[in-house]
């Protein structure tokens, strides 16, 4: 679950945890159909996915949260009433609502029994182990197990309410978002990441291609290049001389003078031409991505698929 304070506004975001695969599926559905409505999104993302389990009571709290950005989601422990060997009944608890502390809950129930604020319980034991949670609540012979359980739901954290607030910072301002708005912000953010990343890759490829074009000239005139370097009093002079003689710029000339003479003479023109050709293909690809928003959104859809199989 995401819980974050936006201090200056005195507001806190409290978003229940969700299944990653379902969330990505809903975001992809929104990319495919920007006009999708709430019911359509909820086909992919039916509700929160609490790691501790529990049972979400009804759909109205989820729907309100997704429709308005605020809602109360009631979660109950997963319980079962079973008949014990002695003819009495036990309430078995195997899952708790999200963020409920088991030890504190058991202690609280014991205090309620001791203070006679709840009737019908003779014993409570924790049999939880690595296999999972297992709390046993013994019901007195004369008591109704279902009434005892209802009282426990009303009086303890066997039933809790998760007050969801889907608050996010949008353009520097805290804003409560409904599900579609939240997913739209996510998609827009991912698109911005793809744009920036592609711009970075494009610049890197262009810079490398530019240096290689300079090296190609050096190979074509290798003897003269080596002679200029050898006859210049230092690197800075060699650089200026190369720039004047071959029309290179500072970056290209720097790349040449930084190489050892042995490296320069061993450079193969075909290797450099192959690398330039590969870079030109990449540059074309990056420019195509940057020019096409639809393409950027398709990349968003392709990339998260790997996360859903974790």
Predicted regions: what is each one?
Residues 1-6:
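Short, small-residue-biased leader/transition segments that mark boundaries at the very start
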Residues 7, 11-310:
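C-terminal interaction appendages of subunits in large macromolecular complexes
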């Amino acid at each position: 679950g995401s819980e974050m304070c936006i201090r200056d506004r005195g507001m806190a975001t409290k978003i229940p945890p969700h299944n990653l695969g379902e969330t990505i599926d809903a975001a992809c559905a929104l990319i495919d159909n920007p006009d999708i409505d709430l019911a359509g999104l909820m086909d992919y993302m039916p509700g929160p996915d609490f790691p501790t389990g529990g049972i979400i009571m009804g759909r109205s709290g989820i729907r309100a949260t997704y429709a308005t950005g605020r809602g109360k989601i009631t979660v109950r422990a997963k319980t079962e009433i079973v008949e014990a060997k002695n003819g009495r009944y036990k309430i078995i608890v195997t899952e708790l609502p999200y963020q409920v502390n088991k030890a504190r809950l058991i202690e609280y129930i014991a205090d309620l029994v001791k203070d006679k604020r709840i009737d019908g319980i003779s014993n409570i034991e924790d049999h939880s182990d690595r296999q999972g949670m297992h709390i046993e609540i013994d019901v007195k012979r004369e008591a109704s197990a279902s009434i005892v359980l209802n009282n426990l739901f009303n009086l303890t954290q066997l039933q809790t309410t998760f007050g969801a607030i889907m608050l996010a910072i949008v353009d520097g301002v805290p804003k409560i978002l409904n599900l579609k708005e939240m997913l739209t912000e996510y998609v827009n953010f991912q698109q911005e990441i793809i744009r920036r990343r592609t711009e970075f890759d494009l610049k890197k490829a262009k810079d490398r291609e530019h240096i290689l074009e300079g090296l190609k000239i050096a190979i074509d005139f290798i003897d003269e290049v080596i002679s200029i370097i050898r006859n210049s009093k230092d690197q800075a002079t060699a650089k200026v001389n190369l720039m004047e003689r071959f029309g290179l710029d500072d970056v290209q000339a720097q790349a040449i003078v930084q190489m050892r003479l042995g490296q320069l003479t061993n450079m193969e023109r075909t290797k450099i031409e192959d690398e330039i050709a590969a870079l030109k293909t990449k540059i074309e690809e990056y420019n195509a991505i940057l020019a096409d928003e639809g393409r950027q959104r398709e990349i968003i859809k392709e990339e998260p698929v790997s996360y859903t199989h974790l």
